[in-house]
Amino acid sequence: DWSSDVCSSDLVARRESARLVLKKIQEIAGPSSPVILTGDFNVDQTDEVFTILSSSGLQDAFTYAERRLAPNGTFNDFDTELKTESRIDHIFVSQGFRVRRYAILTDSYWTEKPQATIQGSGNAPEELKLKKHIRRAPSDHYPVLAKLSYQGK
């Protein structure tokens, strides 16, 4: 299992990082070992770096998943109201893996607004106390999950 966090600001550095990761995987794991490569690659599925990785013999788990739950892309900038189709966090697998499920987990949490209790509002019964909250993202990236099985080559 390999993980990477690729430089976000320099195109040349991102391209060379992808090539270096692939080279190291070949040197260490060899051509016949099962490989799972995950990471924040800071490029979406339309970028040249993504093409370098997905044309290397590794498969994009999103593309090959039997079932997908991806209501959003993977970057949210800590704002739960942002929506994108871009995935900058990826899971790549070598031949022999079956990608049964793929998901981008968009869970969030709530924090209470100070002094934001409302007593019986609108259609709600009067005794019902409602509290205003702010929805927050726990990270600037949504986690990516894949359920894999290995069947060999």
Language-model region placement:
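Metal-dependent phosphoester-hydrolase catalytic domains
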Residues: 23-35, 43-153
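Short, well-ordered beta-to-alpha junction loops that form the rim of enzyme active sites
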Residues: 4, 39-41
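Short, small-residue-biased leader/transition segments that mark boundaries at the very start
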Residues: 1-8
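Active-site beta-loop-alpha substructure in enzyme catalytic cores
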Residues: 9-26
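A generic structural signal for short
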Residues: 10, 37-38
